[in-house]
């Protein structure tokens, strides 16, 4: 599985990569972006990843601004230090919402949840007008 990591803090990025490699060594990191602008450009210039891990507070604004700029169907696992954005996250493409510091069991649970959804299920889930929360 190839993933995009949207994270502007080096330590948080490295921690996430370390955990991903421990939990699912077959994961390929397709890219790492640090800002809304960089993420939009990356998504317009590359094949869609299968899953995105996305911080909310980025160097040039909120990750939710990405959804105002491009249509995005890729499922997202939000990673943030703030719990106040959970409802907004599930109004977009979120399949999970992890609070920092992220732990191995958090990533394992998020990947298990992703694995239980096939592509059609994901598209159907993401097309719901107001998902109530995590599966």
Region roles according to the model:
Residues 7:
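Conserved acidic carboxylate
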Residues 17, 32-51:
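Acidic, metal-coordinating helix/loop segments flanking the phosphotransfer/catalytic sites
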Residues 55:
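Active-site residues of response regulator receiver
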Residues 64-73:
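Short amphipathic alpha-helix used as the core "switch/output" element in two-component signaling
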Residues 112-135:
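Conserved binding/recognition cores within well-folded domains
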């Amino acid at each position: 599985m190839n993933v995009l990591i949207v994270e502007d803090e080096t330590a948080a990025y490295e921690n996430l990569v370390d955990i991903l490699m421990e939990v699912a060594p077959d994961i390929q990191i397709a890219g790492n972006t640090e800002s809304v602008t960089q993420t939009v450009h990356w998504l317009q210039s590359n094949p869609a990843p299968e899953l995105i891990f996305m911080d909310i507070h980025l160097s040039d604004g909120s990750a939710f601004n990405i959804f105002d700029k491009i249509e995005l169907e890729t499922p997202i696992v939000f990673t943030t230090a703030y719990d106040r954005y959970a409802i907004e996250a599930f109004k977009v493409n979120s399949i999970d919402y992890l609070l920092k510091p992220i732990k191995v069991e958090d990533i394992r649970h998020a990947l298990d949840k992703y694995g239980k959804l096939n592509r059609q299920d994901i598209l159907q889930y993401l097309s719901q007008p107001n998902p109530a929360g995590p599966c």
